[in-house]
Amino acid sequence: MRCPFCGNIDTQVKDSRPAEDHVSIRRRRFCPACGGRFTTYERVQLRDLVVIKSTGKREDFDRDKLERSIRISMQKRPIDPERIDQMISGIVRRLESMGETDIGSKQIGEIVMEALARIDTVAYVRFASVYKNFQAADDFDKFVSELRPDVPGDE
């Protein structure tokens, strides 16, 4: 593994253990050239997934990109980080087990929204605002009103 600090290709594993999500291995590494320490994660990848964008462009599925967008939607929310990791791993497993190597970005977005809706409605609305490209406050109002059950006298 190449050292992210100095580029040395000869690093050493100092500690290896299951990560909190129990679907990956966490490794602490040390670079003898610069003394840098860093962490890597090893995960099983069932198949190489390709994302088909709405423009028709194809790109390799990037778990880190998925994780970043989910974590942004959950920023400052009272959600256990381990629960977020489990949700992300569940989404990736679901995508990999679909039997398809090509998956539309719209399909991925719907799966993420479904998972977020079960965990936190604020994160769900945040993600939806980007995914559905809200342009005005009315877009938020319409989306949130569809979430709420009809409340008597709330007209």
UniProtKB/Swiss-Prot annotation:
Its cofactor is Zn(2+). The keyword Zinc-finger applies. A zinc finger (unnamed) spans 3-34. Keywords: ATP-binding, DNA-binding, Metal-binding, Nucleotide-binding, Repressor, Transcription, Transcription regulation, Zinc, Zinc-finger. One of its GO terms (biological process) is negative regulation of DNA-templated transcription. Disulfide bonds: none annotated. It comes from the Bacteria. The keyword Acetylation does not apply. Binds 1 zinc ion. GO terms for molecular function: ATP binding; DNA binding; zinc ion binding. Residues 49-139 form the ATP-cone domain. Negatively regulates transcription of bacterial ribonucleotide reductase nrd genes and operons by binding to NrdR-boxes. Belongs to the NrdR family. This is Transcriptional repressor NrdR. It comes from Roseobacter denitrificans (strain ATCC 33942 / OCh 114) (Erythrobacter sp. (strain OCh 114)). The lineage of its organism: Bacteria, Pseudomonadati, Pseudomonadota, Alphaproteobacteria, Rhodobacterales.
